[in-house]
A protein has these predicted regions:
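Short Lys/Arg-enriched helix C-cap and helix-to-coil transition segments
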Residues: 45-79
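Short alpha-helical "recognition helix" segments of helix-turn-helix
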Residues: 22-24
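Short, amphipathic alpha-helical "recognition" segments used to contact nucleic acids or chromatin
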Residues: 1-17
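Recognition helix of helix-turn-helix/homeodomain-like DNA-binding domains
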Residues: 31-52
Length: 79
């Protein structure tokens, strides 16, 4: 999947407080790994190329992003 770095930052900014650790717990990974994902600190599944809107990000594993998008949607649509 390809997206932009600024789009990833927008997803991060839309998450409620404490989401990094909640995402990590759900996926069975460390909170630091989730933070690194959104801060552009390279992981094996994350490749950043120079380009518009902060650069082009090529994700080979989208599970962190998928959980983050779901949590952001749930927060936005909470009653």
């Amino acid at each position: 999947m390809r997206t932009t770095f600024n789009r990833l930052r927008a997803v991060k900014d839309s998450l409620p407080h404490g989401s990094m650790d909640a995402i990590a717990a759900e996926l069975g990974i460390s909170g630091e790994e989730v933070r690194a994902f959104f801060n552009g600190e390279g992981t094996a599944d994350y490749h950043l190329e120079p380009g518009f809107d902060g650069g082009i990000v090529d994700l080979t594993n989208t599970r962190i992003l998928e959980v983050a998008l779901r949590r952001a949607w749930e927060e936005q649509n909470a009653l």
